[in-house]
Design a protein with these regions (language model features):
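Aromatic-glycine hotspot motif
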Residues: 1-13, 77, 82-92, 106-107
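Hydrophobic ligand-binding cavity/cleft-lining segments
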Residues: 1-34
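Tryptophan-centric aromatic hotspots in well-structured domains and transmembrane helices
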Residues: 16-19, 28-29, 70, 97-102
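Residues at helix-coil transition
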Residues: 20-21, 30, 62, 107-111
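Generic macromolecular interface patches on structured domains
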Residues: 25, 35, 67, 108-111
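Hydrophobic-ligand binding "helix-grip"
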Residues: 34-39, 44-96
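A conserved amphipathic terminal alpha-helix motif
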Residues: 94-112
């Protein structure tokens, strides 16, 4: 699991739009975005290097919480909270690949 929090100097509705509006996502995340913003909806992301990924939207609580399931590779959850400086965005990504990668790193460090 990876967890990251950042306080953004923007109102919650602006941060929500940056996470859910395909045109805004294309400005900072992927070159091409299609998003059916409802539980069970599909999200498709494509990048300029030819890579693409598909996710299924699992949770939508407008301006509060958004969650995706990446194929069968894991989940990512975005949570928005008010902060005196704007909006706190918390991103949590869980994936079996992270568990394996971190275990391998721990083993390598133990051997060093």
């Amino acid at each position: 699991m990876i967890r990251k929090e950042i306080v953004l100097p923007a109102a919650r509705d602006e941060v929500w739009a940056a996470l859910t509006d395909p045109r805004q996502l294309e400005e900072w995340f992927a070159n091409d975005v299609e998003l059916d913003l409802r539980p069970g909806g599909e999200a498709r992301f494509s990048w300029g290097n030819g890579e693409s990924r598909t996710a299924i939207v699992t949770e939508v609580e407008p301006e509060e919480r958004l969650a995706f399931e990446w194929d069968e590779e894991g989940e990512v959850e975005f949570t928005l909270d008010d902060d005196v400086e704007g909006t706190r965005l918390t991103v949590v990504e869980t994936s079996p690949a992270w568990t394996t990668a971190l275990a391998l790193q721990a083993s390598a460090l133990a051997l060093a």
